[in-house]
Amino acid sequence: MSNHDQLHRYLFANHAVRGELVSVNETYQQVLANHDYPPAVQKLLGEMLVATSLLTATLKFDGDITVQLQGGDSPLTLAVINGNNRQEMRGVARVKGEISDDSTLQEMVGNGYLVITITPAQGERYQGVVALEGETIAACLENYFMQSEQLPTRLFIRTGHVADKAAAGGMLLQVLPAQERNEDEFDHLAQLTATIKAEELFTLPANEVLYRLYHQEEVTLYEPQNVSFRCTCSRQRCADALVTLADDDVTEMLEQDGNIDMHCEYCGNHYLFDAVDIATLKNGNSASSEQIH
């Protein structure tokens, strides 16, 4: 793949099947930065990041998708990746117990569930809840597509390392809607795609990956879309949250530490507000610009 994270869409000339191919190495590394997640959680976040990028590429409108694992009575209470149609991603996990390096999805989230939230820039928000019936995120999302869209869909997700740095990538195959389906053809293409090696996905150009997989097929590869990490936090958003709190609560926080430190779990930024800042906010003025990285 490219030196930068990119998503490629492709189409088979002789089959009613479309595909996507994505590499998110740099974005994955930024999701993990400033966090000390157990290896199994790192791997899970990588899988969710790839899946969210592939799902977001299916949007036909401006908006975003959130893929959220909600843990039950389990050591992993939450894992969430958010992405939009511009392929801007962010994610975070919350761990409250011991997680071994080889923990399975079920062991990490217990009787939890997967929530897919689609939020158009204009229009109604849609939310689907998916039971964790598969052993992997990919299998759970394949079930989601069959339940919600009745479209046969396969996801192929790989995580690992390149030059000792976290790497992740994946592919999606999906039958085109309103097309006559040939299950044997789709299964054949899925079998070919399943042979993709992690190293190939992490390091090779998209056209070479597709040639290795489908050299007997006629495939159209479209212009790529860049994928990046982007957090939506800001000092102004923090200020907007502070002004909704009761005055007594804000005063108590200031008396405890001398200032209020608001920390973004996604990117690690800190936003400090002192008594002068709070007074300014209460008077209806904008937040000043102090930010700590």
From Swiss-Prot:
Q: Where in the cell is it found?
A: Cytoplasm
Name the gene behind this protein.
hslO
Give the record's PTM text: Under oxidizing conditions two disulfide bonds are formed involving the reactive cysteines. Under reducing conditions zinc is bound to the reactive cysteines and the protein is inactive.
Keyword match Lipoprotein:
no
Q: From the Swiss-Prot or TrEMBL record, give the protein name.
A: 33 kDa chaperonin
Q: Which domain of life is it from?
A: Bacteria
Q: Which InterPro entries match?
A: Heat_shock_Hsp33, Heat_shock_Hsp33_C, Heat_shock_Hsp33_N, Hsp33_helix_hairpin_bin_dom_sf
Q: What are the record keywords, sorted?
A: Chaperone, Cytoplasm, Disulfide bond, Redox-active center, Zinc
